[in-house]
Amino acid sequence: MKTTIAKIGQYVDQEVTLGAWLANKRSSGKIAFLQLRDGTGFIQGVVVKAEVGDEWFQKAKNLTQESSLYVTGIVRKDERAPSGYELTVTSFDIIHEATDYPITPKEHGTEFLMDHRHLWIRSRKQHAVLRIRNEIIRATYEFFHENGFVKVDPPILTGSAPEGTTELFHTKYFDEDAFLSQSGQLYMEAAALAFGRVFSFGPTFRAEKSKTRRHLIEFWMIEPEMAFVEFEESLEIQENYVAYIVQSVLKHCAIELKTLGRDTSVLESIQAPFPRISYDDAIKFLHEKGFDDIEWGDDFGAPHETAIAEHFDKPVFITHYPTSLKPFYMEPDPNRDDVVLCADLIAPEGYGEIIGGSQRISDYDLLKKRLEEHDLSLDAYAWYLDLRKYGSVPHSGFGLGLERTVGWISGAGHVRETIPFPRLLNRLYP
């Protein structure tokens, strides 16, 4: 019976065949232990000399790392194994014998591993992180489908930047200037006025010259937009969504979390509602904690976000930022025009902001004024202004950075490990 490691528990005490790669091996006298992987998981294959004979045993000992095989054996329950099972090998066929695999069991430097990222993703821990990434994506689609959202795909090539930033990748679009998208938000607002509730999932590009463990040049965003949803309701949707994906990872990625040594008790407590602290109170809190490098009107740095997050036992919303710190499209607080109806969701354990969101401006004249204040072309944003001319409604949205979220949930030490092929400052290979 041909099967996969993920399904091997269905065949206890039965003979099965796996298509697999040899991740590692060791031998002890008359027993050889083969660490096998097939993409769905890892399992130990046990080759007993007395059962397979001298010839097969010697073949097993001579197998090279990352050789591809068809392995046949009997499935046994084993509580000590991460998957709960092991395979007593009866025979195997070599599909392709690998030679001089560069990533050996010894320690390697980060640059070496990044140069061999196309191979590094095969390793147990990298595989676990990317499996968790996959589960977050799956749970994202499930959550938004169950809550009545329509998936919409905004363009990646745009003629303008949604936040009026200079951190853009420029290209020529025939005879016009074009830019790689930093956000699909403006297009998603248009889609929300057609479908009510929408979300997108796609790559975004920021030419930031940052070398922190939180930054990538190319990263993936989940961006929902919702018509007839005001600020507080948007926060509720955000916290329910984040709690949903965390619980989905706990349910479906227990082996991966164990492989990574993740403290799951931290994740088990992630349930809505999340605490909220206003920007004003956050500044006061930081001053009380001895931070003298920040004043009202300044944006938070990583140390500030970490200090605020450490005060709470779950993700925390920082709300009502100064208008001067935020993009042009955010709705002002009706009680204070110097702050806007926005929130950043800060993840625990030093992972920083994972969501930025706000209620969007719905008034035509105010939006036009904000565009002018930010020196943005009214012609370029004419279509966006149109949304406020024909049946404008209160609406809100947010963007979740997938890689930072994967990093937090998996406990990965650097955001470069949370995407298969990271694009970093000075790294475009492989």
Swiss-Prot record:
It is found in: Cytoplasm. This is Asparagine--tRNA ligase. PROSITE patterns: AA_TRNA_LIGASE_II (PS50862). PANTHER family: ASPARAGINE--TRNA LIGASE, MITOCHONDRIAL-RELATED, ASPARTYL/LYSYL-TRNA SYNTHETASE. Pfam families: tRNA-synt_2, tRNA_anti-codon. The keyword Phosphoprotein does not apply. Keywords: Aminoacyl-tRNA synthetase, ATP-binding, Cytoplasm, Ligase, Nucleotide-binding, Protein biosynthesis. Its main location: cytoplasm. Its EC number is 6.1.1.22. Belongs to the class-II aminoacyl-tRNA synthetase family. It catalyses: tRNA(Asn) + L-asparagine + ATP = L-asparaginyl-tRNA(Asn) + AMP + diphosphate + H(+). Homodimer. One of its GO terms (cellular component) is cytoplasm. GO terms for biological process: asparaginyl-tRNA aminoacylation. The gene is asnS. It comes from the Bacteria. GO terms for molecular function: asparagine-tRNA ligase activity; ATP binding; catalytic activity, acting on a protein; nucleic acid binding; transferase activity. InterPro entries: Aa-tRNA-synt_II (IPR004364), aa-tRNA-synth_II (IPR006195), aa-tRNA-synth_II/BPL/LPL (IPR045864), Asn-tRNA-ligase (IPR004522), Asp/Asn-tRNA-synth_IIb (IPR002312), NA-bd_OB-fold (IPR012340), NA-bd_OB_tRNA (IPR004365). HAMAP family: Asn_tRNA_synth.
